[in-house]
Design a protein with these regions (language model features):
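Conserved SAM-binding loop of SAM-dependent methyltransferases across substrates and taxa
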Residues: 204-213
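Non-catalytic substrate-recognition/targeting regions of SAM-dependent transferases
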Residues: 74-85, 104-175
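Conserved small/polar residues in nucleotide/adenosyl-binding loops
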Residues: 215-221
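Short, flexible surface segments
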Residues: 6, 191-192
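Conserved alpha-helix/loop element of class I SAM-dependent methyltransferases that forms part
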Residues: 178-191
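Non-catalytic accessory regions of SAM-dependent methyltransferases
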Residues: 1-88
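Nucleotide donor/acceptor-binding cores
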Residues: 69, 192-193
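Conserved class I S-adenosyl-L-methionine
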Residues: 193-199
Length: 222
């Protein structure tokens, strides 16, 4: 089997010895190996990481409004354990895998370069690696600026609604970007209705209901 240190990139073989790809290994994790590539001969270096970042961004450009979106989504982009959300000109990073720790700042730098090629300048990067899942990887919680400090309240617009996102104190990376199309659906189904948005974090569903000329809306956080 060979020797390794938790977090190393290793080649994965099947029972017959056939190479299946490469990934991070961590004996302390319930996910023993997180796959980076299915090509065992592929070098995991800066060129590889840039390709992954570039592919992720190009895909987002063809599928979503990129003003605020999840640019890198872990395993879905073959960058396991890493999430990067873009809020206008701010990036928020969440790293949940030991193996990705060694590459996260390089990936952020590469992503800023890829965005710059499209005329997008990033004014700041904040890390929100403060989820409990980090402990399962043998990692401490981390929360703070990557690089220079900046104003961490970011104004975004989604589905015609304006929000002020607090990337330091907001839940997850500051905002639930994955609920975008559910919020948009509220504008259609709530027209002319009375709406109560219960157990809300930012009142986003109530705001989207309110944009469609409903009779009344209210929101409660508990």
């Amino acid at each position: 089997m060979g020797t390794f240190t938790n977090g190393d990139v290793v080649t994965v073989h099947d029972f017959d010895g056939y190479p299946m790809g490469k990934g991070f290994i961590n004996q302390n994790s319930k996910i023993r190996i997180r796959m980076l590539t299915r090509h065992a001969d592929q070098e995991i270096n800066e060129n590889f990481l840039r390709m992954r970042v570039k592919n992720a961004w190009e895909y987002r450009k063809t599928t979503v409004d990129t003003s605020s979106c999840r640019v890198i989504f872990g395993e879905a982009d073959f960058l396991p354990g890493l999430v990067v959300d873009k809020y206008e000109d701010v990036l928020v990073v969440e790293c949940l895998a030991l193996g990705m720790e060694q590459f996260k700042e390089t990936i952020v730098s590469l992503l800023k370069g890829v965005l710059k090629e499209d005329g997008i300048s990033i004014r700041g990067v904040y890390e929100r690696s403060d989820a409990n899942e980090r402990r399962k990887e043998g990692l401490p919680k981390v929360k703070g600026f990557i690089g220079e400090t900046f104003d961490t309240e970011v104004e975004i617009t989604e589905n015609g609604v304006h929000y002020l996102v607090d990337v330091v104190n907001g839940q997850k990376t500051g905002f639930f970007l994955d609920q975008k199309y559910n919020r948009l659906a509220m504008q259609r189904i709530c027209k002319g209705k009375r709406v109560l948005d219960c157990f809300t974090h930012m009142g986003t569903f109530a705001l989207n209901a309110g944009i469609c000329l409903l009779y009344t809306s209210d929101a409660a956080d508990e």
